[in-house]
Amino acid sequence: MKKWLVTIAALWLAGCSSGEINKNYYQLPVVQSGTQSTASQGNRLLWVEQVTVPDYLAGNGVVYQTSDVKYVIANNNLWASPLDQQLRNTLVANLSTQLPGWVVASQPLGSAQDTLNVTVTEFNGRYDGKVIVSGEWLLNHQGQLIKRPFRLEGVQTQDGYDEMVKVLAGVWSQEAASIAQEIKRLP
């Protein structure tokens, strides 16, 4: 009888200890483009004032779309820091690289600065192996407002959250390059 109780107790304890779930934390990498800024200073100033995300993206969980209408917010695959901060930091890094002669910052730089605000409405993986990044940005250039929508897709070549985050970062970098091209056209 004692052997039976010891066996049950051992199985119960083993079941309790193996129920541990690992949490994974993700940080967007800064995707390096072919363009490199040679100047660390410039006479043109750009303040990336904010990057906003909707409530469903503002939580800790990485978002995955499982059907046309259903989204899952992961419980164990989490952003290492708030997504809006990661998007803003990587945008500043990418624009700094792609805009020689500009000082790009996430803090106000002075009164004669251009100001960029971005609203991201989608930033997720999808059931068909694609990732979606969409939204709009608004640039205040010397009192002139320039507003552009964006919607980009990327394709995962492998399964998993690691790949999804890398592809999302690459697509976000593409949008940063697009914004940089628009800014370069300014007088």
Curated annotation (Swiss-Prot):
- Establish whether keyword Magnesium is in the entry: no
Q: Which terms does the record give in the GO molecular function aspect?
A: identical protein binding
Q: Extract the signal peptide range.
A: 1-15
Annotated membrane topology is: Lipid-anchor
Main localization, broad class: membrane
Q: Where are the transmembrane segments?
A: none
> Where in the cell?
Cell outer membrane
Q: What induces it?
A: By paraquat.
User: Mind telling me which Pfam families this protein's record contains?
Assistant: ABC_trans_aux
* Subunit architecture: May form a complex composed of PqiA, PqiB and PqiC. Interacts with PqiB.
Give the protein's biological function.
Component of a transport pathway that contributes to membrane integrity.
Name of the protein in question: Intermembrane transport lipoprotein PqiC
Originating organism: Escherichia coli (strain K12)
| Gene, per the UniProt record | pqiC
